[in-house]
C-alpha cells in the first residue's frame, strides 16, 4: 500500500484545506473536541438538530458519530446525517463508545453500522468486540485491556463490518481486514483526559476528509496523535493531567510532518 512515512504528509493536506468536520458527539467532550480539531487545523462544527443535520453533513468533509451520551433524539439525528453523508460521498467515522456496556448502547451501535456505510470505526478492543458480537471485558464505557489477539480481532471486525477498523489502546491497530498496521506511539496520560479518545476519532475524520483511502487516513491520524501525546508528556507530564491537556493541545498545533516521520513508530503486520 505504500510507505507510512508518505502518509504522514496528509497532515499538511489537512492544514492546507482546513476540512469541515461535522461532529454529532457527546456532551462531555464537545469543547475539547472542537479545540483539538482547531489545533490540528481543521474546522469543527457541532450540529445536532435533526432539522439541519442532513444539510450540514452534505457540506462537510467528514461526519463523525459518537454515542457517548446517546438518547433517542440524537440517534435519529445520527441516522439522518449518516444517510445524507452516504448520499453525498462524505466519509462517516463512528465511535461506538461503551458498546457492550448496556443493551441500548450495543443495539444502537449495531443499528448505526447496519444502516450507514462507515469509512472507519474507531474504538477500544471491548467496543469493537461487542460490535461484532464477541465478548471482551468492559467496565462502564471504558474497557479494560481484556485478553486475546487484538490484531486478529480488528481483522475480523473489519471483515464483518465491511469497513476500516482502528482499535486503540496501549498499541493501536488499523486494518481493512487484510493489511494491518500497529502504531506504537501514545502516552498513558491520554487515559486521564476525558475525551482524548473521542477527539482522536474526530481527528481521524479530519484526515479522512482529505484522503479517500481510509487505512492511510487512520494510520496517519493515529501516528500524528500519538507523537503529539508523547511530546506533551515530555513537556508537562510530570505536572499532571491538567497541564498535560494544555500541552497536548499545543502539541497538536505545533508538530509537523517531520516530527511525525521522525518519531512515529509504525509496524505492518
From Swiss-Prot:
Entry keywords, A to Z: ATP-binding, Kinase, Magnesium, Metal-binding, Nucleotide-binding, Thiamine biosynthesis, Transferase
The protein's Enzyme Commission number: 2.7.1.50
Keyword field contains Thylakoid: no
The reaction(s) this protein catalyses: 5-(2-hydroxyethyl)-4-methylthiazole + ATP = 4-methyl-5-(2-phosphooxyethyl)-thiazole + ADP + H(+)
Name of the top EC class for this enzyme: transferase
Pathway(s) served: Cofactor biosynthesis; thiamine diphosphate biosynthesis; 4-methyl-5-(2-phosphoethyl)-thiazole from 5-(2-hydroxyethyl)-4-methylthiazole: step 1/1
Residues where substrate binds: 46, 195
Binding site for ATP: 122, 168
Names of the cofactor(s): Mg(2+)
Positions of transmembrane segments: none
Function: Catalyzes the phosphorylation of the hydroxyl group of 4-methyl-5-beta-hydroxyethylthiazole (THZ).
Protein name, as recorded: Hydroxyethylthiazole kinase
Species whose genome carries this gene: Geobacillus thermodenitrificans (strain NG80-2)
Taxon lineage: Bacteria, Bacillati, Bacillota, Bacilli, Bacillales
